[in-house]
Amino acid sequence: MDRPTRRSFLVSAVAGPAAASRISAAPTQARYRILGKTGLKVSEVGFGTEAVSDISLYQRGLDFGINFFDTARDYERGSSERMLGKALAARRKDVVFCSRSYAKDARQFSADLDLSLKETGTDYFDIFYIGAKDNPKDVPDDMLEAQAAAQKAGKIRLKGLSTHRIRAMEPLLARQHFDVVLVPYNFTKGKFDYTPSVDEQAIEKCHKDGLGVVAMKVMAGGARFNRERNLPLKGFFDKNPGAHLSALKWVLRSPFIHTTVPRMTSVEMLEENVRAMSERYGAEDEKILIAHLERIRPYVCRMCGACDGACPRGLPVSDLVRYVTYADGYGDFPMGYRRFQALPAEVRAVRCMDCRSCAVRCPNGVRVRDRLIRAQELFA
């Protein structure tokens, strides 16, 4: 998908005045794509609302032309839906409003939907996801029926699925129940990583099948938001100027991604993300991200699934690494803690320090044992 660029980038060194100028340039207005067969016109960069405490940021996003807003009831310690509903009330028909349920059964899904509608003060969601499902067995038929019934009743316009494992969910997607899929997609899945970008093939298929494709986890760990000195991801974006902008441009280079939902907690982040919509991904960005990938490699899960079932003590390895990233990368300890505490008691009781060595080996270079111990230290 061709998009006009505001200026050309010279192939140059990563650091120095050129890199600094990339960060300081003024933002422009939003650009738009069509969300699959839904026909909805959505801004290429949407608004991920985790950890947003300043309601004026939403108004600023609207001023830039952002019209896609993604939330969940557990974001920002339970206040995100209420705050976003208030912010969007006057522009409700102009925006795409999304939320989700992490329910395990149909009854809870329906209850979650009704409560989210009440919290936001809206009559309907444009998209309501069955959230965080990575195995088709975790989505029973009666939950699909409940989602379809909600659509028929006008409580939701489009049926969504949120997953961290799009390949694993392909059999469910093949049933053609869903209208929109929310998936991780970032530069760690690019040609310069160790594993083949098979997720890109699955995403392309979703696009060709008419599904709306929304990308999450677009910053590959969110390290830009970390400000605490004692955390391992501190300062990675600071050490690699322009990495945040380049990471989002990498995602937007794909014609199979219709919109994205990066979290934004400041005007600076918002303006930089808006810039990404008007600048092409180029050779300079490639250099920046190659360097950045090597810095984050030991810490950030690619969600490739290679470690599934590898722990002899039954730990959900990739989930635990992701929960640590919520705390250490995003600076969102409460989210990581809630996810960890939702695990079965026998999983929460495991201590990796008890093992002499770790049976899990990551093909992408994540230091699995260190990350799991970190999760247990933080959340157990």
PLM features: residue spans?
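Beta/alpha (TIM)-barrel catalytic core signal, keyed to glycine-rich beta->alpha loops juxtaposed to Asp/Glu
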Residues: 131-315, 319-322, 329-335, 341-344, ...
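Conserved, mostly hydrophobic/aromatic
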Residues: 35, 47, 69, 84, ...
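Distinct, well-ordered alpha-helical segments
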Residues: 58, 81-89, 109-118, 137-146, ...
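Glycine-rich, proline-tolerant flexible connector loops at the mouths of alpha/beta enzymes
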Residues: 68-87
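C-terminal segment of N-terminal export signals and the immediately downstream linker at the start
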Residues: 20-45
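Active-site mouth loops of central-metabolism enzymes
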Residues: 45-53, 99-107, 233-239
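N-terminal secretory signal peptides and thylakoid transit peptides that target proteins
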Residues: 1-17
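Active-site groove signature of glycoside hydrolases
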Residues: 120-135
